[in-house]
């Protein structure tokens, strides 16, 4: 974002008209022509990988292949992978916007070989694409190779070095040996690893290149000498002792930053100057009221320090909307936990930049989704399919944060000058500043809210000053911004850094820990306080083998281990068996119950839970001896009810997605014998007609008696490739079970129990629909016997109601409507009588409550149980009875006791003289009642939420009139 974003030193290859879509497609087609399978991008949420918060590299979806635990039906692949780097080692958040090339969300182009080609082909094809196909100047390219590592016992990668010289025209002076930090890749402390070979480009002008050779600037973070492509040669397996063993199969893993490559090929100095970001920047410029960027199609803001914050803000928001929209499209909703909190932090960071720097005070981020989809909806169709949902999710978050953002910024701005004032001061100057802070009533009020550990003003002042002298914002301030105003800590740190201040993170984290401890203590009542003893072995052999998919009874199980569980005065036991038909609670499905028969003695299994690899059966008593065969029998009737509800959940999930959209993802569930509960991502309430449609569609699938198709031990990637639905945030193993009811209707990864055909369910009925969190809805429903009982109960209710109305009408809806009409008529008569009574009271009311203020008659008083409508209707009568030279104020507390109302009247002669206006009076009165109001100069009304203040407010009317007259 400068006056001339074109880089004149790449004109031989640069073509501003070459679109990012063409470049992306050209990369994929180049490798497809060389036998590579074009693979779609994986989700930003890694499938079954609990070690990653977000997908942050192209290799994530192929990790199982490198580890030797998975396979693909192809040995060569090419893709563009959505990536997000916002946490841990790979965290680019702080750099975003402050330079011209870091991003939170980015695309990684890559080509892959799984035991197929190796270094020679990877090097040759990289050169062919960059130089021969895309036309990059060869004399601007540098290659790096691994210099070796004594700690690993590795010599230099002479093979790669020689290949760069033999497969390309690169001279020796532009092939550089680099250390392991730059040129050796490891998946972790152990596992697949190998040397890297990188391609760098020198974009500097000729005079700069002559002055300093490019080889001296490789890998030193020079903005114009940058890495373009990393070729990783995976050929070793790191051992726990630090040694490296050669792999049987050698792999190639390459990664090219798409945004950076587009900038080079379009001849732009910044990735933000490319066509990937231009529509987003222009959309912001069009909406911002700041004159220096409005109307500038090319956004060429003056290059001076004054406008640097504007440039940073534009870049930050353009970057962040991509991360936010793509994350939501992949099922990550902004929240206070895990991945959701990361997205909420990014979103609030963007809103703050827009609000404070671009002066966008209304929700604006959601409006950037449309230009984003226009640019990227083609290769990533999930964006376009979920556009409305993404926009709703973002707007809801914006509106929520904007409610507190302005106040939080005012708080920050009020306190920060005092922090900077104390910086590096002592002695008399410090005493003077303490005095000034003490006199700043607003700042002191804020500090008293922040420093909750003391109410001593001197303690607060001196604690604040001690921290501030070091140029540090106190942790108490940061915590209040977080806890009261919703400021993520990294946003507060960013705002502090803009003022050259640090944040007292130790103090902040102490307060956060204390808050979490309080939350844990408050929920202790809900925590299992059981005293669980260690498992005691009973017999050796295989244990906890689940066979419940195929049978409900195991006649000859053996007890492998037991333990005692004490809860208060209650003692229970948990039993582990060799084989068991009992399903342990998982995936929302409750655990099985049933019996364990030890010879002639039976004990009830009250619950079944999983603990690691163990399946624990809870019983109240434990027979002796335990070393004989045990018959394990599931309560078959209860199991059947659970199966019906679980399969109904799958059918309903499929219909929800079919009806509401692909954005619907499961967020939680309960599958019990008597009901099901299902939480899913969706913003709007599901109306009654839509619920009935979904219900009918599920019942149609039940009537079709669709048979269950079950596939066990399926490689997870194969299952996903078939189109199976994986539940968001669920952790899966490498091999999974797939439950299908018609491949075109419902196919899910699932470990639960199901009916053999949908007809066994019988019936499905919704019970309720509502909201449980922002963007998350909940439905409750019943199936099978429970649904039949629910329908019977509804019919019984209707029958009783029909009996009640039999004398009125044979049609129940018409009878109810007739009663409602009569009720409304009588209510109207009651209202009319009440208002008549109030009107009759006015003469007495005026006589008893009149006072004189500077020759003006002022009448105030209460007419309780009068509504706002009552007061407004009486107001005109009141005014007419008072006549000239009079002011009247009537007050009332509503029937619910929660609100107070006032109506004010001012005679025409007083209005004409300009002495008094009813609207001015109720403005003050409404404010004193905790609300507001308005109206005409002669008649106005107000309301508020502080009914207890009404008498005081009315008593103050004469003084208010006197003040207005003066």
Swiss-Prot record:
Record GO terms (molecular function): alanine-tRNA ligase activity; aminoacyl-tRNA deacylase activity; ATP binding; tRNA binding; zinc ion binding
Cofactor stoichiometry and binding remark: Binds 1 zinc ion per subunit.
Location(s) in or outside the cell: Cytoplasm
Enzymatic class: ligase
Domain of life of the source: Bacteria
Transmembrane segments: none
The keyword ATP-binding belongs to this UniProt entry's keyword annotation: yes
UniProt entry keywords in alphabetical sequence: Aminoacyl-tRNA synthetase, ATP-binding, Cytoplasm, Ligase, Metal-binding, Nucleotide-binding, Protein biosynthesis, RNA-binding, tRNA-binding, Zinc
GO biological process: alanyl-tRNA aminoacylation
Binding site for Zn(2+): 646, 650, 750, 754
Gene Ontology cellular component terms for the protein in this record: cytoplasm
E.C. numbers: 6.1.1.7
Cofactor entry: Zn(2+)
PANTHER family per record: ALANINE--TRNA LIGASE, CYTOPLASMIC, ALANYL-TRNA SYNTHETASE
Function: Catalyzes the attachment of alanine to tRNA(Ala) in a two-step reaction: alanine is first activated by ATP to form Ala-AMP and then transferred to the acceptor end of tRNA(Ala). Also edits incorrectly charged Ser-tRNA(Ala) and Gly-tRNA(Ala) via its editing domain.
Record text about domains: Consists of three domains; the N-terminal catalytic domain, the editing domain and the C-terminal C-Ala domain. The editing domain removes incorrectly charged amino acids, while the C-Ala domain, along with tRNA(Ala), serves as a bridge to cooperatively bring together the editing and aminoacylation centers thus stimulating deacylation of misacylated tRNAs.
Family statement: Belongs to the class-II aminoacyl-tRNA synthetase family.
Stated name of the protein: Alanine--tRNA ligase
Species of the source: Salinibacter ruber (strain DSM 13855 / M31)
Gene: alaS
């Amino acid at each position: 974002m400068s006056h001339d974003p074109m880089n004149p030193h790449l004109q031989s290859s640069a073509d501003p008209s070459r679109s990012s879509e063409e470049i992306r497609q050209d990369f994929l087609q180049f490798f497809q022509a060389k036998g590579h399978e074009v693979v779609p991008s994986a989700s930003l949420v890694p499938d079954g990988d609990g070690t990653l918060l977000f997908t942050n590299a192209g290799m994530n979806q192929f990790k199982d292949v490198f580890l030797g635990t998975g396979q693909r039906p192809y040995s060569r692949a090419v893709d563009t992978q959505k990536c997000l780097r916002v946490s841990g080692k790979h965290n680019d958040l702080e750099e975003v916007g402050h330079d011209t090339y870091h991003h939170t969300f980015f695309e990684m182009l890559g080509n892959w070989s799984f035991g197929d080609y190796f270094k020679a082909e990877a090097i040759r094809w990289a050169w062919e694409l960059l130089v021969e196909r895309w036309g990059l100047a060869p004399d601007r390219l540098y290659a790096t190779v691994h210099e070796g590592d004594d700690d690993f016992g590795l010599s230099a990668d002479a093979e790669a070095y020689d290949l760069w010289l033999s497969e390309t025209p690169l001279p020796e002076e532009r092939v550089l040996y680099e250390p392991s930090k730059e040129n050796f890749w490891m998946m972790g402390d152990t596992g697949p690893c190998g040397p890297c070979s990188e391609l760098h480009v020198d974009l500097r002008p000729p005079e700069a290149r002559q002055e300093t050779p490019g080889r001296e600037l490789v890998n030193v973070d020079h903005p114009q000498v940058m890495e373009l492509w990393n070729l990783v040669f995976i050929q070793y397996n790191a051992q726990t002792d630090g040694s490296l063993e050669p792999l049987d199969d050698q792999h190639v893993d390459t990664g090219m930053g798409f945004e950076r490559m587009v900038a080079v090929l379009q001849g732009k100095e910044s990735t933000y100057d490319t066509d990937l970001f231009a529509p987003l920047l222009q959309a912001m410029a069009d909406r911002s009221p700041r004159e220096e960027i409005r109307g500038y199609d090319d956004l060429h803001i003056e290059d001076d320090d004054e406008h640097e914050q504007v440039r940073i803000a534009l870049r930050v928001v353009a970057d962040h909307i991509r991360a936010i929209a793509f994350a939501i499209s992949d099922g990550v909703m902004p929240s206070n936990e895990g991945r959701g909190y990361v997205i909420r932090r990014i979103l609030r960071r963007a809103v703050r930049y827009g609000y404070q720097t671009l002066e966008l005070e209304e929700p604006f981020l959601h409006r950037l989704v449309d230009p984003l989809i226009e640019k990227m909806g083609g290769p990533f169709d999930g964006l376009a399919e979920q556009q409305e949902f993404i926009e709703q999710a973002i707007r809801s978050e914006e509106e929520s944060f904007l409610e507190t953002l302005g106040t939080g910024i005012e708080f920050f701005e009020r306190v920060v000058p005092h922090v900077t004032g104390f910086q590096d001061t002592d002695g008399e100057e410090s005493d003077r500043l303490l005095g000034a802070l003490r006199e700043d009533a607003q700042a002191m009020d804020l500090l008293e809210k922040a420093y909750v550990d003391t109410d001593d003003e001197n303690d607060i002042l001196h604690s604040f000053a001690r921290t501030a002298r070091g140029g540090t914002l106190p942790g108490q301030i940061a915590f209040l911004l977080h806890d009261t105003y919703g400021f993520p800590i990294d946003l507060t740190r960013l705002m502090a850094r803009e003022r050259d201040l640090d944040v007292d993170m130790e103090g902040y984290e102490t307060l956060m820990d204390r808050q979490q401890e309080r939350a844990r203590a408050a929920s202790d009542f809900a925590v299992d306080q059981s005293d669980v003893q260690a498992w005691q072995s009973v017999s050796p052999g295989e244990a906890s083998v689940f066979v419940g998919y195929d049978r409900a009874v195991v006649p000859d199980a053996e007890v492998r281990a037991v333990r005692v569980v004490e809860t208060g005065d209650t003692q229970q036991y948990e039993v582990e068996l060799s084989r068991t038909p009992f399903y342990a609670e998982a995936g929302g499905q409750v655990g099985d119950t049933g019996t364990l028969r030890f010879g002639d003695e039976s004990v009830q299994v009250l619950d079944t839970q999983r603990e690691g690899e163990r399946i624990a059966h809870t019983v109240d008593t434990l027979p002796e001896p335990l070393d004989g065969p045990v018959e394990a029998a599931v309560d078959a009737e209860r199991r059947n009810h659970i199966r019906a509800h679980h399969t109904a959940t799958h059918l309903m999930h499929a219909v929800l997605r079919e009806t509401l959209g692909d954005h619907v993802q499961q967020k939680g569930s309960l599958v019990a014998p008597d009901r099901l509960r299902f939480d899913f991502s969706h913003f709007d309430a599901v109306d009654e007609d839509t619920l009935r449609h979904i219900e009918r569609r599920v019942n149609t699938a039940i009537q079709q008696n669709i048979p269950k198709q079950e596939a066990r031990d399926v490689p997870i990637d194969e299952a996903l490739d078939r189109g199976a639905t994986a539940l968001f945030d669920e952790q899966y193993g490498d091999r999974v079970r797939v439950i299908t009811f018609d491949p075109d209707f419902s196919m899910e990864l699932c470990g639960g129990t199901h009916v053999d055909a949908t007809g066994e369910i019988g019936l499905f009925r919704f019970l309720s629909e509502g909201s449980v969190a922002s963007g998350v809805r909940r439905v409750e429903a019943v199936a099978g016997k429970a649904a039949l009982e629910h329908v019977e109960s509804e019919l019984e209710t209707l029958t009783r109601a029909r009996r009640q109305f039999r004398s009125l009408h044979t049609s129940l809806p018409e009878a109810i409507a007739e009663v409602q009409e009569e009720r409304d008529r009588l209510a109207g008569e009651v209202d009319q009588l009440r208002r008549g009574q109030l009107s009759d009271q006015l003469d007495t009311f005026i006589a008893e409550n009149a006072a004189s203020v500077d020759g003006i008659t002022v009448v105030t008083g209460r007419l309780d149980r009068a509504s706002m409508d009552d007061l407004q209707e009486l107001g005109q009568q009141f005014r007419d009875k008072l006549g000239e030279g009079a002011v009247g104020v009537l007050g009332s507390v509503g029937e619910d006791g929660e609100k107070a109302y006032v109506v004010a009247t001012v005679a025409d002669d007083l209005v004409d003289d300009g002495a008094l206006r009813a609207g001015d009076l109720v403005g003050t009165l409404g404010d004193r009642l905790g609300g507001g109001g308005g109206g005409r100069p002669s008649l106005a009304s107000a309301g508020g939420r502080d009914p207890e203040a009404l008498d005081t407010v009315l008593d103050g009317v004469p003084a208010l009139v006197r003040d207005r007259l003066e």
